[in-house]
Amino acid sequence: EDLKGVIVLAATNRIDLIDPALLRSGRFDLLFEVPLPDLKTREKIFGIHTRKKPLSKKINLNKLALKTEGLTGSDIEFICRKAAMLAIRQTIDKNQNLAAEQTAEISISEKHFEEAIQLVLNQNVIKK
């Protein structure tokens, strides 16, 4: 049965990972590549994903963006989530009896971001 009015839309910034058989003529009406985010865009992505997180006052989003050239928006989102989890884990390890009101002590530091960035960079090296 023919599907009428169905549009399939997909986007990627890793077109190099798509099977060439899918990219042959006639498979898609239109192909376009979404480029990797530039420095300014990476900084904005960090801002979006850290907006409601307890960051150390020393965190410089531009500095983080400089260290993440070649990474995707989803990589940066993962870095922010991982850095937050590292900060939580560190706080809990320091104080096993952490009370709910003590969660205000949690602060995501540059060290947490460095560790998260390194994890993503190592994963990207393994993929390639």
Give each language-model segment a name.
Residues E1-K128:
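AAA+ P-loop ATPase motor domain of ring mechanoenzymes
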